[in-house]
Structures are given as C-alpha cells and as structure tokens.
C-alpha cells in the first residue's frame, strides 16, 4: 500500500493510524515563521465512527489503508446479520450490527448502500442520502395549532422517529435525509 506524507493528506483519504483505518475529514498544512511545518488533521475512525484531531510533523508519513467502498443493494435482515448483494457479480455479503450501527433504521429493501470493507470484512454501511418511508404513527394535526415550533414526532415504517410538519398524516409517504434524520418533503 502507498505511503503518504502529512502534507499529502486530503479529505476522503483513508490511512492506517495506530493499527486501524481512518478517513481524513480535513487537513490544514501550517508553515510557521519559525520552526518546522506541520499538518493539523481531523480524522474519523472507520471502525467506530469516532472523530480524532491529531497534529503531524511535515516529515511524518502513514500507510494508506486497504479499504474498499462497494455499492451494494440491501436485501434483508435475518435478525443477526444484514444481507447485501453486488449487482454485477450477484455475490452476497453480510454485515453485523456493529458495522450497521445506527443506520439500521434507514435500510429499506432494494436500497443502494455503500459498504466499506477492510480486510474483506464490512466495517461500515452508509445508506442512501435520501429515502422515502411511510408514516405509521403520528398525532393528528389540529387546524390552527401552530403554536411552538410547528412540528410533531412521527414514527416511520422502519421504526425511525422524525419531526414532521403538522399537516403530515398517518399513511403518507415522506422523503427523509438519512445523514441528519430530518424530514425533507412529502412524496406525491
């Protein structure tokens, strides 16, 4: 695998740090008037999702991580594993609850997901940015009830709870941003 100096760090680069894969989120190269240049780097730990800030000298180098992102289709959950399929090879892959994390509530059948593999094992699953889900439970919106923030909680078909406008009713299909967990619009 390639080796990268700290001044080569760019957002999206995947590197090995302390024996684990990390993704660089931001990197600022600083060249002070006196002293050695350094890079201030914000990284996300791919195994747990935790964020780390670290300062590297300009002479420091790290190995690139052997991490692959695959576009796979979500098939089903058997209670223990979530199953995905590669649409080109029809090869199936299973991910455990640790790899899925909080994204389980955004997985719907036939959704195109990005599965990140490290050493051939799934370490994270990213659902599509926007999905359409049906509302299965919410309070009725009363006419003229606009006091407060103008939102109410709604339970979706996957079990996720999002805040929706007062006019949205049970049985309607809405579009949700999976990155923030927020209501986007009604689907016609």
Curated annotation (Swiss-Prot):
What Gene3D superfamilies is this protein classified in? 2.30.30.30, Nucleic acid-binding proteins (2.40.50.140)
Single GO biological process annotation from the record: peptide biosynthetic process
Instruction: Report the sequence similarity comment from the record.
Output: Belongs to the elongation factor P family.
Compartment(s) of residence: Cytoplasm
- Which Pfam families did the record assign? EFP, EFP_N, Elong-fact-P_C
Give the originating organism.
Answer: Yersinia enterocolitica serotype O:8 / biotype 1B (strain NCTC 13174 / 8081)
> According to its UniProt entry, what is the function of this protein?
Involved in peptide bond synthesis. Alleviates ribosome stalling that occurs when 3 or more consecutive Pro residues or the sequence PPG is present in a protein, possibly by augmenting the peptidyl transferase activity of the ribosome. Modification of Lys-34 is required for alleviation.
Protein name (database record): Elongation factor P
Q: Give the Gene Ontology MF terms in alphabetical order.
A: translation elongation factor activity
Q: In which pathway does it act?
A: Protein biosynthesis; polypeptide chain elongation
Query: What are the alphabetically sorted keywords of the record?
Result: Cytoplasm, Elongation factor, Hydroxylation, Protein biosynthesis
The chain residues annotated with the modification N6-(3,6-diaminohexanoyl)-5-hydroxylysine are: 34
**Modified after translation how?**
May be beta-lysylated on the epsilon-amino group of Lys-34 by the combined action of EpmA and EpmB, and then hydroxylated on the C5 position of the same residue by EpmC (if this protein is present). Lysylation is critical for the stimulatory effect of EF-P on peptide-bond formation. The lysylation moiety may extend toward the peptidyltransferase center and stabilize the terminal 3-CCA end of the tRNA. Hydroxylation of the C5 position on Lys-34 may allow additional potential stabilizing hydrogen-bond interactions with the P-tRNA.
InterPro entries assigned:
Elong-fact-P_C (IPR015365), NA-bd_OB-fold (IPR012340), Rib_uL2_dom2 (IPR014722), Transl_elong_fac_P/YeiP (IPR020599), Transl_elong_KOW-like (IPR013185), Transl_elong_P/YeiP_cen (IPR001059), Transl_elong_P/YeiP_CS (IPR013852), Transl_elongation_fac_P (IPR011768)
Q: Which GO terms describe its cellular component?
A: cytoplasm
The protein's matches in SUPFAM superfamilies, at most eight in alphabetical order, are given as: Nucleic acid-binding proteins, Translation proteins SH3-like domain
Q: Give the primary localization class.
A: cytoplasm
